Amino acid sequence: STRKESSAASDVYKRQGELLALYGSAYNVNIRVFNDIQHTITGWPGGKPNADDSNRPERATPYPKKVIIFSPHPDDDVISMGGTFHRLCEQHHDVHVAYETSGNIAVGDEEVIRYCEYLRDVCAKYTEDETVKKKAEEIIHFLRYEKVEGEAEKRDVLFMKGTIRREEARAGARYSGIKSDDHIHFLDLPFYETGLVKKNDLSEADIAIVKKLLTDVKPDEMFVAGDLADPHGTHRVCLNAVLAAIDEL
């Protein structure tokens, strides 16, 4: 099995001959790649205290660090770096998580109906005030009988969808190790809030929100998600917001 894998690897290098021309053999290429990658892998994502950090991807000091994890949607933190998130908290760093957009349009209408029915029934049980109960019934009726596909979402529906995602994100952050709710930040960047799949362009209003968070927290380390293959995607826009904020500070 090992011989077959080695032969297959050699065939790849033969077809992509430039690497062999540069390094002489497949073995040399493998060693070079291994040496480059090994120093980017660590069990101490915030840096290992009281250790030589000359060959580590993150410096040992200061310890503990103030860390911000930027999550484009309210789930990208745990999807893309859940283990790292947990390890940072486990190793006693001061971890903040910033959800850059509400992610509201990803929530299905049936979810909103279910939560509104729950809200309606709770209000009917515990309060005589009809305000919230009537609003829940209004949203349920709209989604079941009046909504037209392709139109921008109503603000009340967007609020409900955003709230559902917000509480899911809060639960995920707590599970990952966040102890205090004031370390969970919902930025609700304005470029996202169109109610449609198509979003607005990044603006100074978005950048200002990120700048304020950076100024308030003063992080020693940041983790930023970004899909560089899609220049108009939400992940790329969120990355650009952080980079622009850093440039302006």
PLM ranges: what are they?
Residues 1, 6-74, 78-248:
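Active-site beta-strand->loop->alpha-helix modules in alpha/beta enzyme cores, enriched
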